[in-house]
Amino acid sequence: MSHPRWFGAALLAALAAVASLAIVAASGAAGPPLPKSSNGNPVEVVGTGVPTPTAFAFTGSTVFAGSGPNEETNGPGGLFTVADRKATKVPNTPPIVFGLAWQSDKLYVSTGPSIVALEGWDGTAFSKETVIFASTNKKFAGFNGIAFGPEGRLYAGLSLNPKYDHSQNPYKPSQAVVSMTAAGKGMRVVAEGMRQPFQLNFPKGSKYPYVTVLGQDKGGKAPNDEIVVAKPGQNYGFPTCTWILPKQEKACKGFDEPAIFLPPHSSPMGIGSIGNTLYVSLFSGTGKGPEVVEMSTKGQPRPLLTGFAAPVIALGVNQGSIYVGDLTGSIYKVAAK
């Protein structure tokens, strides 16, 4: 991958292990088999051909899908619209996308080292691109997912520099969730002590983002993956505390406990919500392969979609349906209820 420090060492390692499986799964003439829903609702293919899907955004009937670097060709991904079982590249847009958020008739895009705002959408292309935040400091690990809070500030998870996979990154800000104005001003740290906060979502009525956090993959006993509710001033302990209890009970004293623990290596990626129900894509799953789970804001995940041909990354919610993208490049949709 061309930008490993922006996308995360944990995901890189997993992608390398499963890339060949994704190729095989996608190579059939009929495409990969459809995942199965636990609620009995049909799963449909919205589009195909989105390499390494990372995020979704929606406006009207338009579905935007962001894409990271192409894992098979090492070429760029970018921004696509998906409809009628195909993906269409949006011209003159960033070649790599890690997060998307639609707000006030603008599409905000996390490209890694920068966040840009696209406006003037005519159904095919945007007429204007504005860089609202960009870092030229090579020590800045970059941005992952983004989401707008109810007060209008833009929140972002910061990417992992793999050099600090088990240690504190001395560069500030890092290993944190940050927020800024819609114009990219006044960036400040919201919460810290997270190895790699990936995607964010504000459930109905929540002032704070629910954030998927990827735990360590190597070096001793693997800690649980996490979902945190990033409240101002909180510190979730990384790297001093990775919540391996009771072993780390003393080390974790004084830190803020994550809201939800998930099994090690389950790798929570995308996150969305309908009311107080969370929907989370698990890259590796809880033991039976990649899956999408649903749970209350207090946890207790249960399967919603299983049987994917390849690991899942992107997840979004729109008009009562769950959208998910896997490494075959396929985008699926299923009604939540």
Where are each of the predicted segments found?
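Asp-box/WD-like beta-propeller blade repeats and closely related beta-sheet repeat scaffolds
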Residues: 113-148
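A short beta-strand motif characteristic of beta-propeller blades
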Residues: 42-48, 86-92, 130-136, 186-190, ...
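Bacterial N-terminal signal peptides
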Residues: 11-23
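Beta-rich, blade/repeat-based domains predominating
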Residues: 49-62, 93-106, 110, 137-154, ...
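Bacterial N-terminal signal peptides that target proteins for export
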Residues: 1-13
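Beta-propeller domain segments
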Residues: 31-37, 143, 160-188, 194-302, ...
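Beta-propeller domains
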Residues: 64-84
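Short loop/turn segments immediately following the C-termini of beta-strands
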Residues: 68-70, 112-114, 120, 159-161, ...
